[in-house]
């Protein structure tokens, strides 16, 4: 007797804008991991530019459907959070109206939670996971009274809609602590599912190999900092520590990061860092990678011969990988990072990491001095203090000479166990297994909401059309053909019949 076929679970991701940011990388990795584990996966998004997305999306490995891209992302440069929520609600409405809403066993939503109640009400047999990268209300700027007032309803909406999810995931224990302080009225204990890094090595472009030969001579050693050119990244910590270190004469410091010519902070901050380097008597040079890639022959190696600091802007992913592979140490300067993916990208190559002892690095980096016999060490965690950092730079030289293989072994091992795509998808898989059979139970809001909505619509219709009965027949048609709600259809037909035949 043949066995019955096993049901293939269907998972839908709902994400606002499928670009190339950190949140998008997590969604793509989670989707690909679950797909490889046997799930039927679809990503729904309000926007996806196939020329500006990750390879798994570009080459069709993952199924992506766009809904609502025609809706505006802002109104005269303002109201972006309002537009983002409306775009997500439209996307969800489209799933409801087309009947796709009931096709999926699990919905995984991130960044915006406004659609969660609609999923809860219209897909009662599905489960909803919400992945919180960080509370949105803590990321929003509140300059002035009007902006503070404008944010209030969205803060309330975020807390309520997030609490409707069947389970909530966060990207680190640090975010979990912030979540608990921010959403104190939610009796929720989020589960930590760490983001991952791709353990496969990216192909290095010949152009980037040639550039490395130009900027490094005679096997010169260098430290590396990778961050966006933003003041909150505290890149001056790396520069000052390097200036105070004895290694300034034998090493270089490469500052690499995202840089937008249309972003005034990026431009101003780079100038501030260059000024700091000059004040510290460190010779420096700036290389714009986009300009270099257009005319590599116009960039001779003599430009870099005496430079102690090299500021690199907008480098390719290929050059970034090459820089990480060859550096002596990654200097990760931000404080209170929600997670921080760059240390993982360094550790996968066996590169030690020096990071600030707050936020995500506390969970990703194993401090050299905090482990017995330095077992499992992957770097150093220190306060955001240049003196402390310069000491590590000097002390690390002897450590590398005696036992550099320690980091070469420990980094990749830790990545594979905790931060690989397989590890992350396994955590998602276990979470889905846990909630898929869990009874949702009855919630007061979900019981009252449909009735309150029907009453509101009926009251508004009565005010607008008076005793006319035809609007209710129209509402019945909309409920059946658009909303596909049998209960609402029957209700409006009863109202229609009552108005027509009660007199």
From Swiss-Prot:
GO terms for cellular component: endoplasmic reticulum membrane. GO terms for molecular function: GDP-Man:Man1GlcNAc2-PP-Dol alpha-1,3-mannosyltransferase activity; GDP-Man:Man2GlcNAc2-PP-dolichol alpha-1,6-mannosyltransferase activity. It catalyses: a beta-D-Man-(1->4)-beta-D-GlcNAc-(1->4)-alpha-D-GlcNAc-diphospho-di-trans,poly-cis-dolichol + GDP-alpha-D-mannose = an alpha-D-Man-(1->3)-beta-D-Man-(1->4)-beta-D-GlcNAc-(1->4)-alpha-D-GlcNAc-diphospho-di-trans,poly-cis-dolichol + GDP + H(+); an alpha-D-Man-(1->3)-beta-D-Man-(1->4)-beta-D-GlcNAc-(1->4)-alpha-D-GlcNAc-diphospho-di-trans,poly-cis-dolichol + GDP-alpha-D-mannose = an alpha-D-Man-(1->3)-[alpha-D-Man-(1->6)]-beta-D-Man-(1->4)-beta-D-GlcNAc-(1->4)-alpha-D-GlcNAc-diphospho-di-trans,poly-cis-dolichol + GDP + H(+). Pfam families: Glyco_transf_4 (PF13439), Glycos_transf_1 (PF00534). Mannosylates Man(2)GlcNAc(2)-dolichol diphosphate and Man(1)GlcNAc(2)-dolichol diphosphate to form Man(3)GlcNAc(2)-dolichol diphosphate. The chain crosses the membrane at residues 444-466, 473-495. Glycans are attached at residues 59, 173, 262, 403, 500. It is a multi-pass membrane protein. Belongs to the glycosyltransferase group 1 family. Pathway: Protein modification; protein glycosylation. Its EC number is 2.4.1.132, 2.4.1.257. It comes from Kluyveromyces lactis (strain ATCC 8585 / CBS 2359 / DSM 70799 / NBRC 1267 / NRRL Y-1140 / WM37). Keywords: Endoplasmic reticulum, Glycoprotein, Glycosyltransferase, Membrane, Transferase, Transmembrane, Transmembrane helix. It comes from the Eukaryota. The keyword Magnesium does not apply. It is found in: Endoplasmic reticulum membrane. The keyword 4Fe-4S does not apply. Coiled coil: none annotated. Its main location: endoplasmic reticulum. InterPro entries: ALG2, Glyco_trans_1, Glyco_trans_4-like_N. This is Alpha-1,3/1,6-mannosyltransferase ALG2. GO terms for biological process: protein glycosylation.
């Amino acid at each position: 007797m043949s066995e019955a076929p096993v049901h293939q679970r269907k998972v839908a991701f709902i994400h606002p804008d499928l670009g190339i940011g950190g949140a998008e990388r997590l969604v793509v990795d989670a989707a690909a991991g679950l797909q490889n584990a046997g799930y039927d996966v679809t990503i729904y998004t309000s926007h996806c530019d196939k020329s500006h997305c990750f390879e798994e999306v570009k080459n069709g490995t993952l199924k992506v459907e766009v809904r609502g891209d025609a809706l505006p992302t802002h109104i005269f440069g303002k109201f972006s959070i309002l537009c983002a929520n409306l775009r997500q609600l439209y996307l969800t409405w489209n799933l409801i109206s087309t009947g796709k809403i009931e096709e999926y066993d699990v919905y995984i939503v991130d960044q915006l939670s406004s659609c969660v109640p609609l999923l809860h009400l219209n897909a009662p047999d599905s489960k909803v996971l919400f992945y919180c990268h960080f509370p949105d209300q803590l990321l929003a700027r509140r300059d002035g009274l009007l902006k503070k007032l404008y944010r209030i309803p969205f803060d309330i909406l975020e807390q309520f809609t997030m609490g409707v999810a069947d389970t909530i995931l966060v990207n680190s224990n640090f975010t979990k602590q912030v979540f608990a302080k921010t959403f104190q009225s939610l009796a929720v204990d989020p589960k930590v599912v760490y983001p991952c890094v791709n353990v496969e090595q990216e192909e290095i472009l010949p152009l980037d190999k040639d550039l490395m030969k130009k900027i490094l001579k005679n096997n010169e050693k260098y430290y590396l900092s990778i961050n966006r050119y933003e003041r909150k990244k505290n890149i001056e910590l790396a520069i000052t520590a390097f200036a105070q270190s004895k290694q300034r004469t034998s090493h270089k410091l490469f500052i690499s990061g995202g840089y937008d010519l249309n972003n005034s902070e990026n431009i101003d901050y780079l100038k501030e860092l260059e000024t700091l380097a000059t004040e510290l008597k460190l010779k420096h040079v700036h290389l714009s990678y986009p300009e270099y890639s257009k005319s590599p022959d116009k960039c001779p190696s003599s430009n870099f011969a005496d430079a102690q600091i090299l500021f690199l802007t907008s480098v390719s992913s290929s050059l970034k990988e090459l820089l990480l592979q060859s550096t002596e140490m990654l200097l990760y300067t931000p404080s209170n990072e929600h997670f921080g993916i760059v240390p993982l990208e360094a550790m996968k190559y066996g590169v030690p990491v020096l990071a600030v002892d707050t936020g995500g690095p506390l969970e990703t980096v194993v401090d050299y001095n905090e482990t017995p016999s330095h077992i499992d060490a992957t770097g150093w965690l220190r306060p955001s203090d240049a003196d402390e950092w310069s000491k590590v730079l000097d002390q690390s030289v002897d450590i590398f000479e005696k036992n550099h293989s320690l980091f070469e072994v420990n980094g990749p091992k830790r990545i594979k166990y905790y931060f690989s795509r397989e590890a992350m998808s396994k955590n998602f898989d276990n979470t889905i297994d846990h909630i898929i059979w869990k009874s949702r139970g009855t919630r007061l809001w979900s019981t009252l909401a449909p009735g309150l909505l029907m009453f509101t619509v009926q009251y508004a219709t009565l005010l607008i059309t008076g005793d006319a009965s035809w609007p209710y027949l129209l509402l019945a048609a909309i409920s059946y053909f658009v909303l596909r709600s049998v209960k609402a259809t029957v209700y409006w037909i009863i109202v229609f019949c009552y108005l027509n035949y009660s007199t």
